[in-house]
A protein has these predicted regions:
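Conserved, mostly hydrophobic/aromatic
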Residues: 3, 87, 146, 260, ...
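Short, solvent-exposed turn/loop segments enriched in Gly/Ser/Thr/Pro and often Arg
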Residues: 156-167, 324-329, 397-403, 446-449, ...
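Acidic/aromatic-lined carbohydrate-recognition and catalytic surfaces
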Residues: 28, 32-39, 47-59, 65-69, ...
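Conserved alpha/beta catalytic core and glycan-binding cleft of carbohydrate-active enzymes
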Residues: 239-242, 447-569
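Low-complexity, glycine/alanine/valine/leucine- and proline-rich hydrophobic stretches
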Residues: 566-601
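Hydrophobic faces of well-ordered beta-strands that scaffold small-molecule active sites
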Residues: 116-120, 153-157, 320-322, 394, ...
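Active-site-proximal helices and loops of the catalytic beta/alpha 8
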Residues: 327, 331-354, 406-509
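Active-site-adjacent "subsite" loops/lids of carbohydrate-active enzymes
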Residues: 184-185, 190, 330-378
């Protein structure tokens, strides 16, 4: 027994196959974050994972309380035909309770496969009706146009996770306050019941739509206007049985989240600086705020109900694939609620590689694998279930994190001073499969970069679709695997136009980065080869030809970047930069009304739709 039993790897292998040792000091710090010195073994978890048809022996008699409420008296092996779900086994001799998770083990196949769709940063997809950023009304419009006129079957959006309920607003959708709830900034105010009765609605609408003239998205300005409008609607809200029923169905999680929002408005967004009585969800100030600020507490619950309703309406137009971020802001709602199962002194990142010689730290605290298991995985279950709400599919960002994560001590001199920590991936994948089965949704694992061989094998066995990018693949699209999503690029990588024109290389220099001229040259050669074009071909021709090549991929799902189709040269995010680049703030160059009539998106859609219909 020792360090390896706690999942901490004392060595790691880079992309070139070279092994590196982790310092004993780093190992000790990582173990300390788990509350151990590495002696002995982690305590057993309270959950038993079962697959249909698998005999599970049982000593003595017990009552099996099914999730639906029925109770079965069992002696000997558990029944092999248990329904999928979360059940509870209560032993008759000592009353000991064990969670029994019955999972199908594999995720559903995409119903419409093969099909295609747009990958879009929703905030960037503004229409003339938007208030400075794309919203759920825009998603509904984009989905209707894509499915009814273009023949597409999905829209992949950036994470819609909840941001902090205060100013300033975070620009990054991958650094949320909570992954269990969603961002009210995406609400279409005019679609909220009661909005037409506002006396100053017209002036608010005009001010909101004027924000569309700004070259970059100003979330703080959007927040101020939408908060003003929504608070006025709430003041006139007299109740709705549908809201009451929805609140009841959400359980304690919604109330705890709303309490965090009220406390954040009172004490500031970082709970670690709050008064001691509010610093833990069980603190006396938390119960007090639910009583003394009942109206404000309900207001934040109402906002989540509105988001849920508008997202449901948008999802009725097309299957929406929701993106699950790797983690959360440690100062936010999930960090507060789950502080006992998160390693708050650690940050998720990546070891050194050819792109980042010192490694990367993303500032997101990881789950402690053993405390998470000890909690019956409920935080993870809630996170997956929430992201699957009104979803046709689930994109798991950095899916390798279900197997292992690079933990960086916040005291480390650089991200290179970290270590890999392994997770109980079988349990986590069983939960993903069960939740996807319940939601009728497929799963896609973003498995780009350095990936252990067994990871892709296990994901394939679980029917989690792989990710294939033209930018990363040496093989032509026609040779990609079937069980995958294929695309040209992502939000962190150059667009076709940016690469082809050379503007992305110039942007790297503008952002203060070391321009990767050789890497750009190689990527451009790959693009030329895949698209089958001459080196001086017009960028519009290159874009269409590239997606025609992508259409030959046998993959179940294909996605096209809407910014790619419009010839956008700037990528949404420049990794390694902060204020040097307008990360997550670049809108599409045309409103959706213009997108619908522009030739580029129709040409790309026609190329991909031919594959889906052939």
């Amino acid at each position: 027994m020792g360090v390896a039993d706690w999942g901490v790897q004392e060595r790691w292998q880079d992309a070139q196959g070279k092994w590196h040792d982790v310092s004993p000091e780093t190992v000790a710090v990582v173990l300390a974050a788990m509350g151990t010195d590495g002696e002995g073994s982690p305590p057993p978890g309270p959950a038993l994972f079962v697959r249909p048809g698998a005999p599970i022996p049982l000593d003595g008699a017990a009552d099996l309380v099914l999730e639906a409420g029925a109770t079965l008296r069992v002696e000997g092996p558990l029944p092999t035909d248990l329904p999928f779900g979360y059940h509870t086994l209560v032993r008759l001799d000592d009353g000991r309770r064990t969670d029994v998770v019955v999972s199908p083990g594999t995720c559903p196949r995409p119903e419409l496969a093969p099909t295609w769709g747009w990958a879009v940063q929703l905030y960037a997809a503004r229409s003339t009706e938007s208030w400075g950023m794309g919203d759920l009304g825009d998603l509904r419009r984009l989905g209707r146009w894509t499915s009814q006129e273009l023949g597409g079957g999905l829209i992949l959006v950036n994470p819609l996770h909840a941001a902090h309920p205060t100013l300033p607003q975070s620009d990054s959708p991958y650094f949320p306050s909570s992954r269990r709830f969603r961002n009210p900034l995406y609400l279409r105010v005019e679609d909220v019941d009661g909005a037409p009765a506002l006396p100053d609605l017209e002036s608010l609408v005009n001010a909101g739509r004027a924000l569309n003239d700004q070259p970059h998205i100003d979330r703080d300005a959007v927040f101020r206007l939408k908060a003003q409008a929504l608070e006025q609607i709430w003041e006139r809200f007299t109740g709705d049985p549908a809201f009451d029923a929805w609140r009841e169905a959400q359980g304690d999680a919604l109330g705890d989240y709303a309490a965090f929002c009220v406390l954040a408005e009172e004490h500031g967004p970082d709970w670690r600086g709050w008064p001691e009585a509010a610093r833990h969800p069980d603190g006396p100030d938390v119960a007090e705020v639910k009583r003394t600020q009942y109206g404000r507490w309900r207001f934040h619950q109402w906002l989540q109900w509105l988001v849920d309703r508008q997202l449901q309406a948008a999802s009725a137009e097309i299957g929406v694939m929701h993106d699950l971020a790797v983690g959360v802001d440690p100062a936010g709602a999930d960090g507060w609620l789950w502080q006992d199962v998160l390693a708050l002194d650690m940050a998720v990142g990546a070891p050194p590689d050819e792109f980042a010689s010192l490694g990367q730290s993303w500032g997101l605290p990881p789950f402690d694998p053993w405390r998470l298991r000890g909690a019956g995985y409920h935080p993870f279950i809630q996170t997956i279930r929430a992201t699957l709400g009104h979803a046709g599919g689930l994109r798991l960002d950095h899916v390798m994190g279900l197997f292992r994560l690079w933990w960086v001590p916040r005291s480390a001199d650089s991200p290179a001073g970290g270590a890999y920590v392994r997770y109980c991936h079988d349990d986590l994948l069983d939960i993903v499969a069960l939740e996807c089965h319940r939601a009728g949704a497929y799963a896609v694992g973003e498995d780009l970069g350095t990936v252990e061989d067994h990871v892709r094998e296990e994901l394939a066995r679980r029917r989690v679709l792989s990710y294939r990018l033209v930018w990363f693949e040496e093989k032509p699209p026609a040779q990609y695997p079937e069980q995958a999503l294929a695309a040209v690029t992502t939000h962190d990588l150059p667009t076709i136009a940016g690469l082809w024109t050379g503007s992305d290389l110039a942007d790297q220099q503008t952002a203060g980065m070391e321009p990767n001229a050789e890497g750009t040259r190689q990527l451009r050669e790959r693009l030329k080869h895949v698209a089958g074009v001459d080196g001086d071909a017009p960028v519009e021709e290159v874009i269409t030809a590239t997606y025609e090549a992508l259409s030959r991929a046998p993959c179940m799902l294909l996605t096209a970047g809407l910014d790619d189709a419009l010839g956008v040269q700037k990528r949404p995010n420049m990794p390694g930069t902060t204020d040097q680049w307008p990360n997550w703030r670049i809108p599409l160059p045309l409103p959706l009304e213009g997108v619908e009539t522009a030739p580029g998106p129709r040409a790309v859609a026609a190329a991909l739709d031919r594959r889906a219909r052939s």
